[in-house]
Regions:
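N-terminal periplasmic/intermembrane-space "pro-region" immediately following the signal or transit peptide
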Residues: 21-114, 121-126, 245, 250, ...
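Outer-membrane beta-barrel pore domains
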Residues: 132, 169-171, 181-186, 192, ...
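A short catalytic or substrate-binding loop motif that flags glycine-/basic-rich loops and adjacent residues
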Residues: 90, 226-227, 335-336
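Bacterial N-terminal signal peptides
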Residues: 7-17
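A general secondary-structure boundary signal
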Residues: 32-36, 42-47, 52-61, 112-114, ...
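Acidic-residue sensor for enzyme active/binding pockets
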Residues: 28, 36, 50-52, 160, ...
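Outer membrane beta-barrel
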Residues: 94-291, 296, 301-303, 377-398, ...
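N-terminal secretory signal peptides that target proteins for export/translocation
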Residues: 1-4
Length: 466
């Protein structure tokens, strides 16, 4: 009996002892599995690091080293067994570094070149015929370089110059001069403040960037009536940016105060300033016929009191000459002028339709008993432009009709029809453009003694942005 009891007790003890041993064995197997997986991951990562180190060594091997005196050190070559120093004759030149001097968080260097070939009645659509006619030519239309930047303190800036502006001593010679130079405080998208020199906010076509125009040149009414670049200050913004983010582009406003004498001038002609305002409304942005579509409307107003000898057509021509041609309008006496415009831009997929009407009242002022020396006149003009991508994002056809009435003599209207093709090699960055322009002079038609009243021109352009 005792022996049987002892046997039962020993059997029970052994059975109970086997349970933790088996559990312990299972636990060790799991741990070993985890360790194996971890080791495998480390091996894979180690292989990746070896590849990266090998790649970096290859890059460093191609970079020249310099000593404390700026002389290039000899390169080291390895035969796989020993490291041999073999001096390689190279030009001793210290490295060059370009870094920003200030605390900017963003700095961008860019620019663009536009080269033209102009044949036929060159620039006749701008009123340059008869006594102001131009000859066939190759022309560097624009060659600009710009620097833009941004600060963490909510300021951005732009400095741009053009190598193809008149140098001021000879209208046929060009030199480098400033186009855009401004600082913009953008802390609040609804109310930004801009100070410096840039295009006054007047006219859709005038404020469209040069590189994004669908015709090679802007229309005559745009050049005759809009104020172009000015020096001053501007308040502008998009009121719905934070209040209604989905419709942030619904409304954009601009209000600026400028000297009114054009760009790169140090003096104001009097103690008055040009005031300019513009509103842009985008009432629709969505899809039509399955295509992205939008409708943009705009309106502008301008007022300025100018003194004698001020050029009021700073972009193109407005003064009607004796033979019906045009030239810049330099005031023979003081004036007060008010201009306004309205524009619309409809886009439906590959199709764009743009129209703009511009008008101006130029009224003479008597100053210190001196009459203005000219009669009041009210120039006006418009253009309508349609374009369509024949090949999506590559080949675009353009048709444009424009007209200007200077309103200085009877029948002084000038009309032009432009037919164009644009080939986008790499978007706007590399673009080829071709325009055929036919121009009618109503003044020449009613006064045939002055010569031809119909003019034809072909313009070709290569554009490259960098």
């Amino acid at each position: 009996m005792v022996s049987k009891g002892v046997t039962l007790i020993v059997t029970a003890i052994l059975t109970l002892g086997a349970i933790p041993i088996r559990a312990q064995h299972d636990s060790e197997s799991e741990r070993l599995g985890k360790l194996e997986r971890a080791v495998e991951k480390l091996q894979n990562r180690n292989a990746e690091l070896e590849d990266e180190v090998s790649s970096l060594k290859k890059r460093l091997a191609s970079v020249p080293e310099y000593d404390a005196n700026g002389n290039q050190k000899p390169k080291s070559e390895s035969d796989g067994k020993a490291l041999l120093e073999k001096p390689i004759p190279t030009e001793e030149k210290p490295p060059v570094f370009v870094v920003q001097r200030g605390p900017e968080i963003k700095l961008t260097l860019g620019g663009f070149i536009q080269a033209n070939f102009e044949d036929g009645d060159v620039s006749a659509f701008e009123g340059r015929f008869g006594m102001t006619a131009l000859k066939d030519r190759f022309r560097l239309r624009r060659a600009r370089i710009n620097l833009t930047g941004e600060f963490a303190e909510q300021f951005d800036f732009k400095v741009e110059g053009d190598f193809e502006n008149s140098d001021g001593t000879n209208s046929n010679r060009t030199a480098f001069s400033a186009t855009d130079i401004f600082v913009n405080w953008h802390r609040y998208p609804e109310a930004q403040i801009k100070v410096g020199q840039w295009k006054a906010p007047f006219g859709l076509e005038q404020t469209t960037p040069d590189t994004q125009l669908l015709s090679i040149e802007r229309s005559l009414p745009t050049g005759a009536i809009t104020p172009e670049r000015q020096i001053g200050i501007q308040l502008w913004g998009k009121p719905f940016t934070n209040f209604w983010p989905e419709q942030k582009d619904l409304l954009t406003y601009y209000f600026g105060v400028f000297n009114g004498n054009g760009r790169n001038t140090t003096l104001n002609d009097n103690n008055n300033f040009m005031t300019v305002g513009r509103l842009e409304l985008m009432p629709f942005k969505g899809q039509i016929f399955g295509q992205d579509a939008s409708l943009k409307l705009g309106g502008d107003v301008l007022n300025s009191r100018d003194e004698k000898a001020t050029n009021i057509s700073q972009s193109l021509n407005l003064l009607v000459n004796a033979d019906g041609s045009l030239s810049p309008y330099v005031l023979p006496g003081a004036d007060e002028r008010t201009a306004w415009s309205a524009d619309a831009w409809l886009n439906i997929g590959p199709f764009d339709l743009i129209g703009e009407y511009l008008a101006e009242d130029v009224d003479g002022r008597t100053v210190a008993g001196v009459p203005p020396g000219f009669s009041n006149f009210d120039p006006s003009g418009y253009y309508i432009q349609a374009s369509y991508f024949i090949l999506p994002k590559k080949l675009q056809g353009v048709v444009k009709w424009e007209a200007l009435e200077p309103d200085q003599v009877d029948d002084d209207n000038i009309h032009s029809l432009i037919l164009g093709l644009n080939y986008y090699i790499h978007g706007d960055a590399i673009k080829l453009m071709a325009n055929y322009v036919h121009t009618w002079s109503r003044f020449r038609e009613t006064h045939p003694g002055f010569g031809n009243d119909n003019f034809d021109e072909v313009i070709l352009r290569l554009q490259l942005m960098f």
